[in-house]
């Protein structure tokens, strides 16, 4: 299930001129992702919540723009999941399936900040900071930070500057 909410409103002069305030949230909840429990198994398993496959992800934020300037603050969240799996048993007998096991990977959250300006004929400039709160990527059950680099950003706090000039 995906849910996208967006609310925009005009705001009065806040000392910098009249502007526009935008609140948004993008939410994804994966209910099922079925596949074979393991190669050769006829048993199907819902993979959501297993290692590296969180069930939910969402982003929410606020944008404020006025005149030729804007500022944006975004919180990015990735849900939790279990570290490992083990064979499924029923009355002591293997069923050909797997179940979640091991510890639980915590939810992960970071903040991004972006400021921008349209300078007319001089172009557009943007300054931003990814992972503003400098949250480390979450390690796997053995303490390895490189395991989930496709899921978490392992760069740490990163600032950037962009100047776009069209001619």
Regions found by a protein language model. Give the residues of each.
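Gram-negative outer-membrane beta-barrel transporters
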Residues: 1-87
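C-terminal beta-signal and adjacent terminal beta-strands/loops
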Residues: 31-34, 77-91, 116-167
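Short sequence motifs at beta-strands and strand-loop junctions characteristic
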Residues: 50-55, 105-109, 153-155
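Generic long, charged, amphipathic alpha-helical segments
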Residues: 75-76, 84-111
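Extracellular loop and loop/strand-boundary signature of outer-membrane beta-barrel proteins
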Residues: 43-49, 90-93, 97-103, 146-151
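Outer-envelope beta-barrel architecture signal
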Residues: 15-21, 56-58, 67-69, 109-111, ...
């Amino acid at each position: 299930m995906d849910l996208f909410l967006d609310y925009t409103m005009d705001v009065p002069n806040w000392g910098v001129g009249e502007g526009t305030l935008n609140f948004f949230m993008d939410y994804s909840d994966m209910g099922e992702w079925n596949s074979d429990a393991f190669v050769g198994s006829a048993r199907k398993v819902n993979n959501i919540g297993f290692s590296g496959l969180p069930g939910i992800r969402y982003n929410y934020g606020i944008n404020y723009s006025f005149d030729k300037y804007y500022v944006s603050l975004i919180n990015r969240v990735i849900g939790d999941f279990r570290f490992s799996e083990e064979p499924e048993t029923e009355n002591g007998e293997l069923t050909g399936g797997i179940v979640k096991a091991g510890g639980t990977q915590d939810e992960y959250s970071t903040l991004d900040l972006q400021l921008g300006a349209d300078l007319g004929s001089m172009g557009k400039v943007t300054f931003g900071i990814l992972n503003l709160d400098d949250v480390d990527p979450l390690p796997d059950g053995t303490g390895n930070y490189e395991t989930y680099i496709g899921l978490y950003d392992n760069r740490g706090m990163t600032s950037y500057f962009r100047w776009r000039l069209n001619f």
